[in-house]
Amino acid sequence: MARPPKSNVTNKFMDTLREKLLEKYSAGTANLYLTKLRILNKDVPFTSLAFLKEHAQMIELMSGIDNANTRKSYLTAVVGVLDCLNVPAYNKINNYYKKALNDFKVDVYNKIDPNEKTTTQKDNWVDWKEVVAKQALLQEQADKVTQKEIDQNNLHAIQALERNVLLNLYTQLPPRRNNDYYLMRLGSGDDESNWYDGKKFTFNVFKTARARGKEVIDVPPALEKILNNYIRMMDLREDDYLLFSHDDKRKSPATMTRALNSIFGKKIGASMLRHIWTSHLLGNVMPIIKENSYKMGHSVGTDLN
């Protein structure tokens, strides 16, 4: 999609719209949505959303984008903005874009091979049973750590406890993103951090928090036992970070990725574990859904909804 020379990237209308979007979305998402809409408006700042009423033209414009994920991002931006505004005059138009977005998702889903992997994934992939086996090995190592070793700041012993806790977080519950646990502290407090109170995880800060709100999850008893033993041995206190407590500044969750890479000896981080988990859980489901949809005479989207 060719772009004309760019003028000023914003104006009063767009600034007001951004403030409205910030009530529902993060700053990054709000800015991204505005940028997508500006590009659809010939990369010119817009003073209304009237250009979106030319939905056939907009869809044709998006269809010229080669990358499927990029095409989806434009549709998502349009629907996201119109959903947030919820203006009756645009509801019919929004339904058109929603249908286009849903049709796109169904088309992509029909083409998905749940076992297909990127080059990086192929080079570093392990099955979920291998992840579980690695967890069992880490548990054996952690069980051998003594309180005396921890009190003497034995780095090997401390690392054994930390690595065991880290991988347990990704195996005893569906794997979450790095930041979700990197920003987790002990106790219960403000909404600027995530918390573990000895029984539950409270997630306030995560990628989709603006849309989903706070999430509270019961910690499985086996994981609770491991966490509480780790906290006791490491002498962690209220407000301390759960993981890598020496890292007070919390500059980057890359610390989590490096630790996971070290555990597996491969480029396996949170994202890869999420893919491995999803493949383990759903790998054989899509062919069944597709066959069922065909036999029932409706689309995959009907079953997915």
Residue ranges of model-derived segments:
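A short, glycine-centered helix-capping/turn motif at helix boundaries
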Residues: Q159-R163, L169-G189, N284-P287, M296-H298
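Active-site/catalytic core of tyrosine-dependent DNA strand-transfer enzymes
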Residues: D218-W277, L282
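Flexible interdomain linker/hinge and immediately adjacent N-terminus
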Residues: Y90-I150
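Basic, Lys/Arg- and aromatic-enriched nucleic-acid-binding interface segment
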Residues: V132-N179
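Helix-turn-helix DNA-binding helix
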Residues: A30, R71, M256, N292, ...
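Short, polar N-cap/turn motifs at the start of nucleic acid-interacting alpha helices
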Residues: K266-K267, V285-N305
